[in-house]
């Protein structure tokens, strides 16, 4: 499978991103039925999209208000494209653009996401977690690979 192109979000991407959030994020956010809901969920965030053959198939949204400490708020791939490395491509693009001071929250019960971030070198911070309306969560922090000697 060919890799996607990762680029900055454009307003014309809103319908595709809305659909992706509704499908891939439904377990977290419930159905997101309109562009206003997507816009509210990502307000003030820097958004990158993954595109293949002119179609947006994933997106990542980063809260940048606490620079240089950035928070990866959303990373979703359309379910029809999951398991193809698109999430890893988006995550690498986020790190390249916003690293090295990145963190995110994930639900403790979301073992798939926890494995995904661990494979990418992110580290769970056992001292930073809590409970929200979705349940127990843990903070995950990006750790740059040590320099090669």
Pin down the residues of each PLM region.
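Acetyl-CoA-dependent GNAT
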Residues: 4, 8-82, 88-93, 97, ...
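A short, glycine/Asx- and small/polar-enriched loop/turn
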Residues: 44, 136-138
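Conserved active-site alpha-helix within GNAT-family acetyltransferase domains
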Residues: 88, 109-126, 132-135
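Conserved GNAT acetyl-CoA-binding A-motif
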Residues: 97-109
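Terminal substrate-recognition subdomain of acyl/acetyltransferases
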Residues: 138-149
């Amino acid at each position: 499978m060919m890799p996607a192109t990762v680029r900055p979000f454009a307003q014309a991407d809103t319908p595709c991103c809305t659909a992706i959030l509704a499908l891939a994020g439904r377990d977290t956010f419930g159905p997101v039925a309109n562009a206003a809901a997507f816009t509210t969920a990502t307000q003030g965030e820097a958004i990158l999209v993954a595109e293949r053959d002119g179609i947006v198939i994933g997106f990542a949204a980063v809260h940048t208000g606490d620079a240089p400490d950035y928070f990866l708020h959303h990373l979703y791939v359309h379910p029809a494209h999951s398991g193809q490395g698109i999430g890893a491509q988006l995550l690498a693009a986020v790190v390249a653009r916003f690293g090295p001071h990145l963190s995110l929250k994930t639900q403790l019960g979301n073992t798939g996401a926890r494995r995904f971030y661990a494979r990418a070198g992110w580290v769970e911070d056992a001292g930073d977690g809590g409970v929200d309306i979705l349940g127990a969560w843990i903070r995950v922090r990006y750790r740059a690979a040590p320099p090669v000697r």
